[in-house]
Design a protein with these regions (language model features):
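Conserved structured core elements
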Residues: 5, 9-12, 28-32, 77, ...
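Conserved hydrophobic/aromatic pocket- or pore-lining residues that grip, position, or stack substrates
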Residues: 8, 38, 65, 83, ...
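Structured nucleic-acid-interacting core domains from mobile-element enzymes and related host factors
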Residues: 40-66, 131-133
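Conserved helix-loop functional segments at active or binding sites
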Residues: 44-48, 69, 89-92, 121, ...
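Short loop segments at secondary-structure junctions
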Residues: 55, 86-89, 172
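RNase H-like nuclease fold core
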Residues: 62-105
Length: 239
């Protein structure tokens, strides 16, 4: 749990799943097998860690994602977000929705609202440290229905119960404190916090959150203000 919280965002999703079965009587042999698989993964990636630095300008970017009703036992949804400062991830979370959600759009809105709370805290923290973001932070999502709902200025009977969630995003946009933008699912960094990925995709998303094998780099390179070749391509060119 310490690694997942501090330096290994790639562990967030599997540990969030396993944490649901820690209570006595809830875990079964398949959960123990999954835990051992995580330990084997840790042994084979012991040098993996976050690399911070890169761009000199303070740019706060966030990605939010949800996997609707993916819990077969409860039909609850997995949600996750990540925020990067300059180049590396500085905040991330993978969790499960507290209730059953009625649509994928609703799941994305709940994930976005959770991410917005963290974004506001990070903005206040940077301001207190004397490094406020010079431009509105950007939150990327991969659900166009959510973006359309946040742009509209009317309530409907189907969305009244989640109005407070997307009104926050709308208010922050009107104040110029947030910019919502669409990103394709394959480029959404938060995807690694909502579902199990194929090995190739998992490795690609580790690169996107600036999680690299630190044992392959020299000490001079690790403390360099600029990132090594390849790290600058964490974000698609369209960003």
């Amino acid at each position: 749990m310490y690694l997942m919280t501090c330096t290994r965002p790639d562990l967030a999703y599997p540990l969030s799943i396993l944490a649901r079965y820690v209570a006595p009587g809830r875990h079964r042999p398949e959960h123990m097998a999954a835990a051992k698989r995580v330990l084997r993964y840790l042994c084979s990636t012991s040098g993996l860690g976050l690399v911070l630095g890169g761009r000199r300008r303070v740019v706060l970017r966030g990605h939010a994602d949800a996997s609707w009703a993916d819990d077969q036992a409860t039909q609850q949804s997995s949600q996750g977000y990540t925020f990067s400062l300059r180049s590396g991830s500085v905040s991330w979370r993978s969790t499960r929705s507290s209730s059953v959600l009625g649509s994928s759009c609703e799941a994305e809105i709940y994930a976005g609202a959770m991410a917005l709370q963290e974004l506001r805290w990070l903005t206040y923290l940077l301001s207190d440290l004397g490094e406020p973001p010079r431009s509105p932070p950007v939150l990327y999502v991969d659900n166009k229905a959510m973006l359309a709902l946040c742009r509209e200025h009317r309530l409907e009977h189907r969305t009244k119960h989640i109005a407070l969630r997307y009104f926050l995003a709308r208010e922050l946009q009107q104040r110029g404190q947030l910019r919502l933008a669409y990103v394709a699912s394959e480029a959404n960094t938060a995807d690694i916090f909502t579902k199990a990925l194929a090995p190739g995709d998992h490795q690609r998303f580790c690169t996107m959150v600036a999680c690299f094998d630190l044992l392959d780099w020299s000490c001079d390179l690790l403390f360099s203000p600029t990132l090594p070749m390849g790290v600058s391509y964490m974000y698609p060119p369209a960003f």
